[in-house]
Regions:
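N-terminal Rossmann NAD(P)H-binding glycine-rich loop of SDR-like oxidoreductase domains
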Residues: 10-19
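C-terminal helical subdomain
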Residues: 173, 181, 191-242
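Residue(s) in the substrate-gating loop at a strand-loop-helix junction
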Residues: 129
């Protein structure tokens, strides 16, 4: 069997990826989020708020019997309210780094602790963003947290190559592009006073330039099942053909 742990399965890319994987009865998907939106015989759900660090710290991966693939997908993210620094809400800043950095770090650490010694394919995919490498006004929290997650991916990849050169856990930072998700709707509803680029994102939507989450999910699945073809830690879905 193949086992998948995906954060943020209630909507967007996480939900789409879970549904894509669940088309194969050999795949068991565990969703990690605050709400359940998927009903499938092979779907399990763990209700967990990634802003609650104490609860996340207690989360533990269980023992798996004869797995062929074990994969963690850190998809969940908090997109802070678009405001310039000096006007940002302190609680929103804390939530951003809790959800986008601290919780993924804890979950990755627990995943490696649980499954490093397993004799099967083990994969970690961190969903990144163009914001990880581009400064965007009013997105200070999101840009910096995605940049931190990208660097975490690179460091773990380095550690795996040094400590387990013949059998590393594969880790990828995958940038999905501009995807039609609830986060995009929130961006389009931002006041131009707080985000001068809002018109560009409205145009993306009007011109139907947003990627379908299902297509993005299918490309992520291609990475998972073809890791030998993906050498670099950083991947953009636009470079993947399906």
């Amino acid at each position: 069997m193949n086992y998948f742990f995906i954060t943020g399965t209630s909507s967007g890319i996480g939900q789409a990826l879970a549904n894509v994987l669940l088309t194969d009865k050999n795949n068991i998907v565990t969703g990690i989020s605050r709400s359940v939106t998927i009903n499938s015989e092979n779907y399990r759900h763990i209700k967990l708020d990634l802003n609650d660090i104490e609860s996340v710290s207690k989360f533990d991966f269980g023992e798996l019997k004869e797995p062929e693939i074990i994969c963690l997908v850190n998809n969940s993210a908090h997109f802070s309210e678009s405001k310039h620094y000096g006007k940002a809400d302190t609680r929103d800043i804390i939530k951003n780094y809790n959800v986008n950095n601290i919780s993924p770090g804890i979950i990755i650490n627990n995943f490696l602790s649980a499954y490093q010694s397993y004799n099967c394919k083990r994969i970690i995919i961190n969903i990144s963003s163009g914001a990880a490498t581009t400064a965007i006004e009013s997105w200070s929290n999101y840009c910096s947290s995605k940049a931190a997650l990208l660097m975490l991916s690179k460091v773990i990849a380095l550690e795996q190559s040094l400590n387990y050169p013949s059998d590393p856990v594969k880790i990828y930072s995958v940038s999905p592009g501009v995807v039609d998700t609830p986060a995009q709707e929130r961006i389009r509803n931002t006041s131009p006073e707080n985000f001068s680029m809002v018109g560009k994102f409205i145009e993306f939507h009007e011109k139907k330039q947003l990627s379908d989450p299902v297509i993005v999910a299918e490309k992520i699945a291609k990475i998972i099942f073809n890791t030998d073809n993906f050498i670099n830690t950083e991947i953009h879905v636009n470079d993947i053909q399906i």
